Amino acid sequence: MATTKSVLVLIFMILATTSSTFATLGEMVTVLSIDGGGIKGIIPGIILEFLEGQLQKMDNNADARLADYFDVIGGTSTGGLLTAMITTPNENNRPFAAAKDIVPFYFQHGPHIFNSSTGQFFGPKYDGKYLMQVLQEKLGETRVHQALTEVAISSFDIKTNKPVIFTKSNLAKSPELDAKMSDICYSTAAAPTYFPPHYFATNTSNGDKYEFNLVDGAVATVADPALLSVSVATRRAEEDPAFASIRSLNYKQLLLLSLGTGTNSEFDKTHTAQETAKWGALQWMLVIQQMTEAASSYMTDYYLSTVFQDLHSQNNYLRVQENALTGTTTKADDASEANMELLVQVGENLLKKPVSKDNPETYEEALKRFAKLLSDRKKFRANKASY
Protein backbone atom coordinates (compact mmCIF):
# COMPACT_ATOMS: atom_id res chain seq x y z
CA MET A 1 0.00 0.00 0.00
CA ALA A 2 2.78 2.39 0.99
CA THR A 3 4.65 1.48 -2.16
CA THR A 4 1.60 2.14 -4.34
CA LYS A 5 1.05 5.48 -2.63
CA SER A 6 4.68 6.46 -3.19
CA VAL A 7 4.44 5.58 -6.87
CA LEU A 8 1.27 7.66 -7.25
CA VAL A 9 2.93 10.63 -5.56
CA LEU A 10 5.94 10.29 -7.86
CA ILE A 11 3.71 10.14 -10.95
CA PHE A 12 1.81 13.21 -9.75
CA MET A 13 5.05 15.11 -9.24
CA ILE A 14 6.27 14.20 -12.73
CA LEU A 15 2.98 15.24 -14.31
CA ALA A 16 2.93 18.48 -12.35
CA THR A 17 6.48 19.29 -13.40
CA THR A 18 5.74 18.46 -17.03
CA SER A 19 2.57 20.54 -16.98
CA SER A 20 4.44 23.46 -15.44
CA THR A 21 7.20 23.16 -18.02
CA PHE A 22 4.77 23.17 -20.93
CA ALA A 23 2.78 26.03 -19.41
CA THR A 24 5.95 28.07 -19.12
CA LEU A 25 6.92 27.11 -22.66
CA GLY A 26 3.49 28.06 -23.96
CA GLU A 27 3.81 31.52 -22.46
CA MET A 28 7.15 32.23 -24.09
CA VAL A 29 7.54 34.85 -26.81
CA THR A 30 9.71 33.66 -29.69
CA VAL A 31 11.93 36.05 -31.63
CA LEU A 32 14.06 35.64 -34.76
CA SER A 33 16.57 38.36 -35.65
CA ILE A 34 18.60 38.49 -38.89
CA ASP A 35 21.61 40.77 -39.43
CA GLY A 36 22.42 42.85 -42.48
CA GLY A 37 25.31 42.03 -44.79
CA GLY A 38 24.36 42.11 -48.47
CA ILE A 39 25.18 38.93 -50.38
CA LYS A 40 26.40 37.41 -47.10
CA GLY A 41 22.72 36.84 -46.35
CA ILE A 42 23.44 33.44 -47.88
CA ILE A 43 24.94 32.41 -44.53
CA PRO A 44 21.77 32.93 -42.43
CA GLY A 45 19.87 31.51 -45.42
CA ILE A 46 21.66 28.19 -44.89
CA ILE A 47 20.89 28.31 -41.15
CA LEU A 48 17.21 29.09 -41.71
CA GLU A 49 16.90 26.25 -44.22
CA PHE A 50 18.32 23.82 -41.66
CA LEU A 51 16.02 25.10 -38.89
CA GLU A 52 12.88 24.98 -41.01
CA GLY A 53 13.80 21.48 -42.15
CA GLN A 54 14.08 20.34 -38.53
CA LEU A 55 10.68 21.84 -37.70
CA GLN A 56 9.12 20.06 -40.67
CA LYS A 57 10.55 16.73 -39.51
CA MET A 58 9.50 17.19 -35.89
CA ASP A 59 5.95 18.17 -36.78
CA ASN A 60 5.70 15.80 -39.76
CA ASN A 61 4.53 18.72 -41.86
CA ALA A 62 6.29 19.60 -45.13
CA ASP A 63 4.32 22.88 -45.24
CA ALA A 64 5.62 24.10 -41.87
CA ARG A 65 7.18 27.55 -42.16
CA LEU A 66 9.25 29.71 -39.82
CA ALA A 67 6.47 32.30 -39.58
CA ASP A 68 4.33 29.62 -37.89
CA TYR A 69 6.76 29.43 -34.97
CA PHE A 70 8.06 32.95 -34.31
CA ASP A 71 6.02 35.75 -32.75
CA VAL A 72 8.44 38.38 -34.04
CA ILE A 73 10.83 38.22 -37.00
CA GLY A 74 13.14 41.19 -37.37
CA GLY A 75 15.85 42.11 -39.82
CA THR A 76 17.87 44.93 -41.24
CA SER A 77 19.34 45.36 -44.72
CA THR A 78 19.59 41.87 -46.26
CA GLY A 79 18.06 40.56 -43.02
CA GLY A 80 15.04 42.75 -43.70
CA LEU A 81 14.73 41.16 -47.14
CA LEU A 82 14.82 37.67 -45.59
CA THR A 83 12.21 38.78 -43.05
CA ALA A 84 9.89 39.84 -45.86
CA MET A 85 10.49 36.65 -47.85
CA ILE A 86 9.44 34.36 -45.00
CA THR A 87 6.52 36.47 -43.72
CA THR A 88 4.88 37.90 -46.86
CA PRO A 89 1.80 35.85 -47.82
CA ASN A 90 1.12 34.28 -51.20
CA GLU A 91 -2.34 33.75 -52.71
CA ASN A 92 -2.93 30.90 -50.22
CA ASN A 93 -1.99 33.10 -47.26
CA ARG A 94 1.19 31.14 -46.68
CA PRO A 95 4.76 32.57 -46.86
CA PHE A 96 5.62 33.08 -50.52
CA ALA A 97 9.12 31.73 -49.85
CA ALA A 98 10.22 28.70 -47.89
CA ALA A 99 13.60 28.87 -46.19
CA LYS A 100 15.00 26.55 -48.86
CA ASP A 101 14.21 29.24 -51.46
CA ILE A 102 16.51 31.85 -49.89
CA VAL A 103 19.89 30.70 -51.20
CA PRO A 104 18.59 30.11 -54.75
CA PHE A 105 17.15 33.65 -54.63
CA TYR A 106 20.61 35.08 -53.99
CA PHE A 107 22.17 32.96 -56.74
CA GLN A 108 19.53 34.01 -59.25
CA HIS A 109 19.29 37.71 -58.45
CA GLY A 110 22.48 38.62 -56.58
CA PRO A 111 24.67 38.97 -59.71
CA HIS A 112 22.12 41.38 -61.24
CA ILE A 113 21.55 43.40 -58.06
CA PHE A 114 25.29 43.93 -57.62
CA ASN A 115 26.12 44.37 -61.29
CA SER A 116 24.27 47.52 -62.33
CA SER A 117 27.13 49.86 -61.44
CA THR A 118 26.47 53.53 -62.07
CA GLY A 119 30.13 54.09 -62.89
CA GLN A 120 30.08 57.33 -60.92
CA PHE A 121 32.88 58.11 -58.49
CA PHE A 122 30.75 60.64 -56.62
CA GLY A 123 27.60 58.55 -56.45
CA PRO A 124 26.24 55.17 -55.30
CA LYS A 125 28.06 52.12 -56.58
CA TYR A 126 24.85 50.51 -57.90
CA ASP A 127 21.72 52.11 -59.34
CA GLY A 128 19.31 49.84 -57.42
CA LYS A 129 16.91 49.49 -60.36
CA TYR A 130 17.13 45.71 -60.60
CA LEU A 131 16.76 45.37 -56.82
CA MET A 132 13.58 47.47 -56.87
CA GLN A 133 12.27 45.54 -59.87
CA VAL A 134 12.68 42.11 -58.29
CA LEU A 135 11.21 43.30 -54.98
CA GLN A 136 8.11 44.60 -56.75
CA GLU A 137 7.78 41.34 -58.69
CA LYS A 138 8.12 39.14 -55.60
CA LEU A 139 6.28 41.23 -53.00
CA GLY A 140 3.71 42.95 -55.20
CA GLU A 141 1.28 45.26 -53.42
CA THR A 142 1.60 43.49 -50.06
CA ARG A 143 1.77 45.84 -47.08
CA VAL A 144 3.01 45.52 -43.52
CA HIS A 145 -0.38 44.68 -42.02
CA GLN A 146 -0.57 41.56 -44.17
CA ALA A 147 2.60 39.97 -42.78
CA LEU A 148 1.92 36.51 -41.38
CA THR A 149 3.56 37.32 -38.06
CA GLU A 150 4.88 40.43 -36.35
CA VAL A 151 7.83 41.96 -38.19
CA ALA A 152 10.46 44.53 -37.25
CA ILE A 153 12.29 46.03 -40.23
CA SER A 154 14.40 49.12 -39.69
CA SER A 155 15.41 52.02 -41.87
CA PHE A 156 16.61 55.59 -41.35
CA ASP A 157 14.94 58.76 -42.61
CA ILE A 158 17.61 61.20 -43.76
CA LYS A 159 15.12 64.10 -43.89
CA THR A 160 13.84 63.79 -40.31
CA ASN A 161 17.15 62.31 -39.10
CA LYS A 162 15.29 59.58 -37.21
CA PRO A 163 15.07 55.80 -37.43
CA VAL A 164 11.89 54.34 -38.89
CA ILE A 165 10.75 50.95 -37.64
CA PHE A 166 8.12 49.10 -39.66
CA THR A 167 6.03 46.79 -37.48
CA LYS A 168 2.42 45.62 -37.47
CA SER A 169 1.95 46.68 -33.86
CA ASN A 170 2.72 50.33 -34.70
CA LEU A 171 0.00 50.66 -37.32
CA ALA A 172 -2.85 51.56 -34.98
CA LYS A 173 -0.99 54.65 -33.79
CA SER A 174 0.91 55.33 -37.02
CA PRO A 175 -1.07 54.06 -40.04
CA GLU A 176 1.36 55.83 -42.37
CA LEU A 177 3.82 53.02 -41.57
CA ASP A 178 1.63 50.53 -43.47
CA ALA A 179 3.90 50.77 -46.49
CA LYS A 180 4.43 48.28 -49.28
CA MET A 181 6.87 45.55 -48.35
CA SER A 182 8.77 46.24 -51.58
CA ASP A 183 9.39 49.86 -50.53
CA ILE A 184 10.41 48.77 -47.04
CA CYS A 185 12.83 46.11 -48.29
CA TYR A 186 14.55 48.47 -50.71
CA SER A 187 14.81 51.13 -48.00
CA THR A 188 16.37 48.85 -45.40
CA ALA A 189 18.89 47.67 -48.02
CA ALA A 190 19.75 51.12 -49.41
CA ALA A 191 23.19 51.31 -47.85
CA PRO A 192 24.88 54.68 -48.39
CA THR A 193 27.55 54.46 -51.13
CA TYR A 194 26.00 51.20 -52.43
CA PHE A 195 22.42 52.14 -53.42
CA PRO A 196 20.52 55.43 -53.82
CA PRO A 197 18.20 56.44 -50.93
CA HIS A 198 14.54 55.58 -51.44
CA TYR A 199 11.66 58.03 -51.59
CA PHE A 200 8.03 57.00 -51.34
CA ALA A 201 4.84 58.27 -49.75
CA THR A 202 1.86 56.83 -47.87
CA ASN A 203 -1.20 58.36 -46.21
CA THR A 204 -1.90 59.30 -42.60
CA SER A 205 -5.17 58.51 -40.82
CA ASN A 206 -6.45 61.89 -42.03
CA GLY A 207 -5.61 61.08 -45.62
CA ASP A 208 -2.68 63.46 -45.69
CA LYS A 209 0.42 62.56 -47.68
CA TYR A 210 3.30 61.22 -45.58
CA GLU A 211 6.75 61.19 -47.16
CA PHE A 212 9.71 58.92 -46.49
CA ASN A 213 13.34 59.51 -47.48
CA LEU A 214 15.05 56.33 -46.35
CA VAL A 215 18.42 54.62 -46.27
CA ASP A 216 19.80 51.34 -44.94
CA GLY A 217 18.48 50.13 -41.60
CA ALA A 218 22.05 49.55 -40.46
CA VAL A 219 22.32 53.32 -40.00
CA ALA A 220 19.62 53.01 -37.35
CA THR A 221 20.44 49.66 -35.74
CA VAL A 222 24.03 49.13 -36.93
CA ALA A 223 23.48 45.81 -38.70
CA ASP A 224 22.39 43.68 -35.69
CA PRO A 225 18.64 44.14 -35.02
CA ALA A 226 18.37 41.73 -32.09
CA LEU A 227 17.66 44.40 -29.46
CA LEU A 228 15.16 46.07 -31.77
CA SER A 229 13.36 42.76 -32.27
CA VAL A 230 13.30 42.13 -28.53
CA SER A 231 11.82 45.58 -27.87
CA VAL A 232 9.05 44.88 -30.38
CA ALA A 233 8.38 41.54 -28.69
CA THR A 234 8.21 43.27 -25.32
CA ARG A 235 5.69 45.79 -26.63
CA ARG A 236 3.59 43.02 -28.14
CA ALA A 237 3.53 41.13 -24.86
CA GLU A 238 2.30 44.28 -23.13
CA GLU A 239 -0.41 45.19 -25.66
CA ASP A 240 -1.59 42.04 -27.46
CA PRO A 241 -4.59 40.32 -25.78
CA ALA A 242 -3.16 36.97 -26.87
CA PHE A 243 -0.31 37.53 -24.42
CA ALA A 244 -2.36 38.83 -21.50
CA SER A 245 -0.81 36.29 -19.13
CA ILE A 246 2.70 37.69 -19.66
CA ARG A 247 2.18 41.45 -19.64
CA SER A 248 5.27 41.93 -17.48
CA LEU A 249 7.59 40.24 -19.97
CA ASN A 250 11.13 39.50 -18.88
CA TYR A 251 13.94 37.76 -20.67
CA LYS A 252 13.12 34.45 -18.98
CA GLN A 253 10.04 34.35 -21.18
CA LEU A 254 11.94 35.11 -24.38
CA LEU A 255 13.28 32.58 -26.83
CA LEU A 256 15.68 34.52 -29.05
CA LEU A 257 17.52 33.29 -32.14
CA SER A 258 19.93 35.84 -33.63
CA LEU A 259 21.61 35.14 -36.97
CA GLY A 260 24.71 36.96 -38.16
CA THR A 261 26.14 37.28 -41.66
CA GLY A 262 29.76 36.77 -40.62
CA THR A 263 32.63 38.97 -39.51
CA ASN A 264 36.22 39.25 -40.65
CA SER A 265 38.59 37.66 -38.16
CA GLU A 266 41.54 39.37 -39.83
CA PHE A 267 40.09 42.86 -39.49
CA ASP A 268 41.36 43.32 -35.94
CA LYS A 269 44.87 42.50 -37.15
CA THR A 270 44.79 44.83 -40.12
CA HIS A 271 45.72 48.08 -38.37
CA THR A 272 47.88 49.12 -35.43
CA ALA A 273 48.01 52.29 -33.36
CA GLN A 274 51.39 53.14 -34.87
CA GLU A 275 50.08 52.68 -38.40
CA THR A 276 46.96 54.79 -37.90
CA ALA A 277 48.53 57.56 -35.80
CA LYS A 278 48.86 59.86 -38.81
CA TRP A 279 45.66 58.89 -40.61
CA GLY A 280 43.39 61.63 -41.85
CA ALA A 281 39.68 61.76 -42.65
CA LEU A 282 39.93 59.78 -45.88
CA GLN A 283 41.76 56.79 -44.39
CA TRP A 284 39.42 56.61 -41.40
CA MET A 285 36.35 56.98 -43.60
CA LEU A 286 37.29 53.79 -45.42
CA VAL A 287 37.29 51.65 -42.26
CA ILE A 288 35.26 53.41 -39.57
CA GLN A 289 31.89 51.98 -40.67
CA GLN A 290 33.21 48.42 -40.54
CA MET A 291 34.74 49.10 -37.12
CA THR A 292 31.51 50.62 -35.80
CA GLU A 293 29.32 47.81 -37.08
CA ALA A 294 31.63 45.12 -35.71
CA ALA A 295 31.79 46.81 -32.30
CA SER A 296 28.04 47.36 -32.11
CA SER A 297 27.26 43.78 -33.10
CA TYR A 298 29.71 42.50 -30.49
CA MET A 299 28.21 44.70 -27.77
CA THR A 300 24.66 43.64 -28.64
CA ASP A 301 25.62 39.99 -28.33
CA TYR A 302 27.59 40.67 -25.15
CA TYR A 303 24.66 42.49 -23.55
CA LEU A 304 22.09 39.84 -24.46
CA SER A 305 24.37 36.97 -23.42
CA THR A 306 25.04 38.62 -20.07
CA VAL A 307 21.36 39.29 -19.36
CA PHE A 308 20.24 35.76 -20.24
CA GLN A 309 23.06 34.24 -18.20
CA ASP A 310 22.27 36.40 -15.18
CA LEU A 311 18.69 35.13 -15.35
CA HIS A 312 19.94 31.52 -15.66
CA SER A 313 18.22 31.39 -19.05
CA GLN A 314 21.24 31.14 -21.32
CA ASN A 315 19.60 28.33 -23.30
CA ASN A 316 16.89 30.80 -24.34
CA TYR A 317 19.34 32.81 -26.45
CA LEU A 318 21.35 31.55 -29.40
CA ARG A 319 23.61 33.74 -31.51
CA VAL A 320 24.75 32.02 -34.70
CA GLN A 321 27.74 33.86 -36.14
CA GLU A 322 30.82 33.04 -38.20
CA ASN A 323 33.75 35.07 -36.88
CA ALA A 324 36.43 33.87 -39.29
CA LEU A 325 35.50 35.16 -42.74
CA THR A 326 38.45 35.71 -45.07
CA GLY A 327 39.07 36.90 -48.61
CA THR A 328 36.10 37.64 -50.85
CA THR A 329 33.57 36.25 -48.36
CA THR A 330 34.00 39.40 -46.27
CA LYS A 331 32.54 41.56 -49.05
CA ALA A 332 28.86 42.45 -48.95
CA ASP A 333 28.61 42.93 -52.71
CA ASP A 334 30.71 40.15 -54.28
CA ALA A 335 27.95 38.20 -56.02
CA SER A 336 30.23 36.15 -58.24
CA GLU A 337 29.20 32.50 -58.42
CA ALA A 338 32.53 31.45 -56.95
CA ASN A 339 32.09 33.67 -53.90
CA MET A 340 28.47 32.67 -53.38
CA GLU A 341 29.54 29.01 -53.41
CA LEU A 342 32.13 29.88 -50.76
CA LEU A 343 29.42 31.53 -48.64
CA VAL A 344 27.31 28.38 -48.90
CA GLN A 345 30.29 26.40 -47.61
CA VAL A 346 30.72 28.90 -44.77
CA GLY A 347 27.11 28.38 -43.72
CA GLU A 348 27.28 24.59 -43.96
CA ASN A 349 30.58 24.44 -42.07
CA LEU A 350 29.23 26.79 -39.42
CA LEU A 351 26.58 24.23 -38.48
CA LYS A 352 29.35 21.82 -37.48
CA LYS A 353 31.27 24.34 -35.35
CA PRO A 354 30.94 24.64 -31.55
CA VAL A 355 28.78 27.47 -30.26
CA SER A 356 31.70 28.84 -28.24
CA LYS A 357 34.95 27.85 -26.57
CA ASP A 358 33.04 27.22 -23.37
CA ASN A 359 30.18 25.38 -25.07
CA PRO A 360 31.18 22.33 -27.15
CA GLU A 361 27.62 21.96 -28.44
CA THR A 362 27.63 22.52 -32.20
CA TYR A 363 25.34 25.04 -33.86
CA GLU A 364 23.57 22.13 -35.51
CA GLU A 365 22.86 20.55 -32.13
CA ALA A 366 21.82 23.89 -30.64
CA LEU A 367 19.43 24.56 -33.52
CA LYS A 368 17.88 21.11 -33.11
CA ARG A 369 17.31 21.89 -29.44
CA PHE A 370 15.85 25.26 -30.41
CA ALA A 371 13.59 23.59 -32.97
CA LYS A 372 12.28 21.21 -30.30
CA LEU A 373 11.37 24.15 -28.06
CA LEU A 374 9.64 25.93 -30.94
CA SER A 375 7.75 22.79 -31.92
CA ASP A 376 6.63 21.98 -28.37
CA ARG A 377 5.53 25.55 -27.78
CA LYS A 378 3.47 25.62 -30.98
CA LYS A 379 1.78 22.34 -30.05
CA PHE A 380 0.99 23.61 -26.56
CA ARG A 381 -0.65 26.76 -27.92
CA ALA A 382 -2.60 24.76 -30.50
CA ASN A 383 -3.92 22.40 -27.82
CA LYS A 384 -4.78 25.29 -25.54
CA ALA A 385 -6.69 27.07 -28.31
CA SER A 386 -8.75 23.94 -29.04
CA TYR A 387 -10.33 23.96 -25.57
From Swiss-Prot:
One GO biological process term: lipid catabolic process
Annotated motif GXSXG, positions: 75-79
Location of the motif DGA/G: 216-218
Any one GO MF annotation of this record: nutrient reservoir activity
InterPro entries: Acyl_Trfase/lysoPLipase (IPR016035), PNPLA_dom (IPR002641)
Signal sequence interval, chain numbering: 1-23
Localisation: Vacuole
Superkingdom per UniProt: Eukaryota
Glycosylation sites: N115, N203
Cellular component terms per the entry's GO annotation: vacuole
Active site (catalytic residues): S77, D216
Enzyme class per UniProt: hydrolase
Coiled coil location: none
Sequence similarity: Belongs to the patatin family.
Other comments on record: Patatin have a dual role as a somatic storage protein and as an enzyme involved in host resistance.
Function as written in the Swiss-Prot or TrEMBL entry: Probable lipolytic acyl hydrolase (LAH), an activity which is thought to be involved in the response of tubers to pathogens.
Comment on protein domains: The nitrogen atoms of the two glycine residues in the GGXR motif define the oxyanion hole, and stabilize the oxyanion that forms during the nucleophilic attack by the catalytic serine during substrate cleavage.
Protein name, per record: Patatin-05
The gene coding this protein: pat1-k1
